[in-house]
């Protein structure tokens, strides 16, 4: 409150060239975007199988949708995926047209889909990338000297469409329940806790995560690999910092920082952090985003999350605290409350930096 009062006082003395106009109250129908708003996702059930050696994924998703205007066509985003089939409700099949330049797919049904709740099942496949966007692999040198491979996602601004077809615009919020098949030795983390892990054949396992709150597609996240963690808690919320095995102890400083920051934000915003956990992950090297505020699974390039006392400088300690505080602020400003379109992302970033 004191910071806001100070800022208001300072601005009161600044001459303005034109009247300041507040934006209108958010309206989903008026929100900017490229997709039609005739069909809106309510929940996604996403099942993906990963082949990280051959860089391929296959998927099937079940999307509960709300048809707001009867239509024969459902248009959603995809980028680099091949949609093999789409079925509505009791087996009504769609004809699929993909526009790779527009990064969309249009599902055409033989008759208008009626207004109300429907179930859409889509089967698809696609690549796992080596570039740090969408779903990709990060090859790095472990402390042991071995070359290791980590599976990582980075969806901001508009790359969730590289892992699953969906309404990949920030205004289209929905819940997500993620299931992923991956190497059995990998530790997998996502926005929510693991609910089940079962063997798949001799070399893989299927990991299921709890359903997220309503959120934008760009905030969904998955990281899997040879990782270990240090753990703590604050205000009743379990906290953890994950790092490549052998480096996990270097996450202690970031963990202690988060234990101080979380109670402060809970009090400052007057809304307690709503997810059942908060995990932070150090991505070794191939992570151009620097840091990302995925709701409940904050990801960082390793040199802004890990602190090695014999080798790190005091400035590194300051940087870690600053970046952790910034990404944690986004759990409210950006994740809980989200801009309707990307032209207001400056407000997300500005507010998190100001905090």
UniProtKB/Swiss-Prot annotation:
GO terms for cellular component: cytoplasm; extracellular space; membrane. CDD domains: M1_APN-Q_like (cd09601). Keywords: Aminopeptidase, Cytoplasm, Hydrolase, Metal-binding, Metalloprotease, Protease, Zinc. This is Aminopeptidase N. It catalyses: Release of an N-terminal amino acid, Xaa-|-Yaa- from a peptide, amide or arylamide. Xaa is preferably Ala, but may be most amino acids including Pro (slow action). When a terminal hydrophobic residue is followed by a prolyl residue, the two may be released as an intact Xaa-Pro dipeptide. Its cofactor is Zn(2+). It is found in: Cytoplasm. Zn(2+) binds at residues 326, 330, 349. Aminopeptidase N is involved in the degradation of intracellular peptides generated by protein breakdown during normal growth as well as in response to nutrient starvation. Its main location: cytoplasm. Pfam families: Peptidase_M1, Peptidase_M1_N. Substrate binds at residues 156, 290-294, 349. The active site is at residue 327. The keyword Zinc applies. Binds 1 zinc ion per subunit. InterPro entries: Aminopeptidase_N-like_N, Aminopeptidase_N-like_N_sf, M1_APN-typ, Peptidase_M1, Peptidase_M1_aminopeptidases, Peptidase_M1_dom, Peptidase_M4/M1_CTD_sf. Its EC number is 3.4.11.2. GO terms for biological process: peptide catabolic process; proteolysis. One of its GO terms (molecular function) is peptide binding. The keyword Hydrolase applies. Gene3D superfamilies: Neutral Protease Domain 2 (1.10.390.10), tricorn interacting facor f3 domain (2.60.40.1730). SUPFAM superfamilies: Leukotriene A4 hydrolase N-terminal domain, Metalloproteases ('zincins'), catalytic domain. It is an enzyme of class 3 (hydrolase). Belongs to the peptidase M1 family.
């Amino acid at each position: 409150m004191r910071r806001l009062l100070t800022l208001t006082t300072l601005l009161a003395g600044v001459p303005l060239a034109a009247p300041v106009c507040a934006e209108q109250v958010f309206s989903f129908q008026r929100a900017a975007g490229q997709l039609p708003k005739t069909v809106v996702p309510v929940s996604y059930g996403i099942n993906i199988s990963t082949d990280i050696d051959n860089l391929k994924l296959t998927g099937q998703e079940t999307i509960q949708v709300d048809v707001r205007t009867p239509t024969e066509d459902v248009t959603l985003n995809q980028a680099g995926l091949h949609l093999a089939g789409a079925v509505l409700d009791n087996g009504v099949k769609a004809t699929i047209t993909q526009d790779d330049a527009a990064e969309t797919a249009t599902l055409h049904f033989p008759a208008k889909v009626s207004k109300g709740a429907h179930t859409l099942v889509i089967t698809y496949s696609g690549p796992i990338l080596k570039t740090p966007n969408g779903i990709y692999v990060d090859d790095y040198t472990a402390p042991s000297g071995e070359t290791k491979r980590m599976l990582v996602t980075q969806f901001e601004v508009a790359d969730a469409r590289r892992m699953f077809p969906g309404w990949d615009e920030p205004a289209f919020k929905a819940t997500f329940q993620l299931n992923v098949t991956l190497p059995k030795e990998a530790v997998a983390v996502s926005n929510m806790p693991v609910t089940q892990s079962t063997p798949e054949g001799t070399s893989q396992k299927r990991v299921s995560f709890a359903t997220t709150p309503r959120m934008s597609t760009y905030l969904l996240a998955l990281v899997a690999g040879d990782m270990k963690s240090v753990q703590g808690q604050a205000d009743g919320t379990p906290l953890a910092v994950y790092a490549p095995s052998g480096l996990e102890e270097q996450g202690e400083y970031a963990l202690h920082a988060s234990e101080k920051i979380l109670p402060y934000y809970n009090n400052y915003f007057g809304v307690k952090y709503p997810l059942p956990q908060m995990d932070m992950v150090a991505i070794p090297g191939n992570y151009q985003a620097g840091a990302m505020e995925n709701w409940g699974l904050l990801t960082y390039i390793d040199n802004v999350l890990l602190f090695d006392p014999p080798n790190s400088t005091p400035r590194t300690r300051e940087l870690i605290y600053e970046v952790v505080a910034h990404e944690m602020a986004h759990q409210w400003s950006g994740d809980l409350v989200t801009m309707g379109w990307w032209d207001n992302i400056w407000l997300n970033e500005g507010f998190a930096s100001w905090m």
